[in-house]
């Protein structure tokens, strides 16, 4: 085999090899509200935590995707809002060599799971600065959420 043919074959194999790497992590937006401060600090603290998750993704360059994990945490105490935190944790990911289904899964589950620890850290930091105890969100199974979302979409399209 000639050197040119070997080089072309190596380049073809390299182009088909799946690549997924995080290029950058960034905090896109963060908001903290504590509407009942400072009176809430005089109450017995029995928090009820509500959590909302959402993800967005878009292609921003050749094989480069922006993924944004949006988390809203609402903590109530005795039925009243103690605080509300909203975070948009972003990341740039280089992804190539995946078919459409694999790419959709990577953008909908793998990338958000990679961003979650950064978002959780930012949420804890702002909550503590608001003079509340750290919330330490439990790990989230983004693969299960992704599968659930797909099943829900399929059920809606069959109706």
Curated annotation (Swiss-Prot):
A Gene Ontology cellular-component term: cytoplasm
Protein transport found in the keyword field: yes
Which SUPFAM superfamilies does the record cross-reference, listed alphabetically? SecB-like
**InterPro entries, per the entry:** SecB, SecB-like_sf
Q: Where found?
A: Cytoplasm
Per UniProt, the keywords (alphabetical) are: Chaperone, Cytoplasm, Protein transport, Translocation, Transport
Gene Ontology biological process terms from the UniProt entry: protein folding; protein tetramerization; protein transport
Superkingdom, taxonomy of origin: Bacteria
**An example Gene Ontology molecular-function term:** unfolded protein binding
The UniProt entry's sequence similarity note says:
Belongs to the SecB family.
What is this protein's function? One of the proteins required for the normal export of preproteins out of the cell cytoplasm. It is a molecular chaperone that binds to a subset of precursor proteins, maintaining them in a translocation-competent state. It also specifically binds to its receptor SecA.
Provide the assembly information.
Homotetramer, a dimer of dimers. One homotetramer interacts with 1 SecA dimer.
Enumerate the PANTHER family for this protein.
PROTEIN-EXPORT PROTEIN SECB (PTHR36918:SF1), PTHR36918
Can you name this protein?
Protein-export protein SecB
Could you tell me the gene encoding this protein? secB
